[in-house]
Amino acid sequence: YKTHYSIWALLGSPLMIGCDIRNMNDATRNILMNRDLIAINQDAMCRQAVKLNGIWAGEDMVMYSRNLSNGDIAIGLFNLSENKSAARFNLDELGLPQSTGHTLEMTEVWPKKTSTVTNGTWIQELDAYDCAVYRAKVVKA
């Protein structure tokens, strides 16, 4: 459910649910009520995410990015393989080369934790069929 809901949010799709919400378990409820992910989906800019061409650990790792109305960037990494894998992308791919003196402060929405991109490269290891979604803010390096 997490991967499915995450891609819907990034693509700006309607967030509909096809289960009896009175009887859903806590894990499902936590996914469907993730306020950070809903905020990305409902962003006022109404832009859809675009697929990026990253330096992948394999063709089963996919990355999407979506510009948000306040200048943040929503980033989704999706491991579509049956093996643990690492995704790597350079800030150049998001239009933020190191020469600008800026980097990204990445706040993960599953779970909520913040870290900063160093040396212009972000590496994220994901379990099989897992995903990571970030709300990234441009900050001084």
Segment roles from a protein language model:
Residues 1-43:
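Aromatic/acidic polysaccharide-binding cleft in carbohydrate-active enzymes
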Residues 93-111:
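Solvent-exposed beta-hairpin/edge-strand motifs
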Residues 117-141:
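C-terminal beta-strand-rich structural cap/linker in extracellular carbohydrate-active enzymes
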Residues 2, 8-11, 16-18, 56-98:
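Carbohydrate-binding surface patches
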